Amino acid sequence: MAISERASRILYGIEFVIFALIPICALAAWALFYGAGSILMFLFALMMLVSSNDSASLLEALRNLAIFAAIVALTGMGLIAIWKFLRLSAAFGNHGSKALQELRETYWRCLAWAALPLLATTALFPYADPDFSGGLLLFSGVTLCVPLFHLWLELRYRGNQG
């Protein structure tokens, strides 16, 4: 039993509001505040690396540089993934499966950009506050899998029908 494209788009809109809106806002805020701060800390760690004299401070500066570089990279990848996901959602919501088919390559790139930040946030967020780890599931990006799966189904099955 197949549902109409109009019903599928309405269902996707509901899925987007329930499962994607909170994580996108939370991840964008996290990227804005934590990512921007990490850029500053990365620059500070770079200055520490340049001015370190002994091996202990050099190792500490290298460690800090690596940590903040990883945070900046994950933040950038997450922002790119969010942008691509919003682009795909707008295309499907406004123009349906035909527009989504034209952006098939963007869908797979979105998944590639999102994989590492999604794994990192899923693995690290529960350790941030063990008392609230269940609630952090809503903010970690795991719930984005529901609308992404819907888009994949649209690409796979409605795209093959023409």
Regions found by a protein language model. Give the residues of each.
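Hydrophobic transmembrane helix segments
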Residues: 18-76, 81-83
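Low-complexity, intrinsically disordered extramembrane tails and loops of integral membrane proteins
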Residues: 1-5, 159-162
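Juxtamembrane "helix-exit" motif on the non-cytosolic side of transmembrane helices
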Residues: 119-132
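Small-residue packing motifs within transmembrane alpha-helices
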Residues: 9-11, 65-77, 85, 110, ...
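Cytosolic juxtamembrane helix at the C-terminal end of the final transmembrane segment
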Residues: 82-102, 106, 130-162
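Hydrophobic alpha-helical transmembrane segments of integral membrane proteins
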Residues: 19-20, 113-114, 143-144
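Short membrane-interface loop/juxtamembrane segments of multi-pass integral membrane proteins
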Residues: 52-62, 91-117
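Alpha-helical transmembrane segments and their helix-start/interface "positive-inside/aromatic belt" motifs
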Residues: 5-22
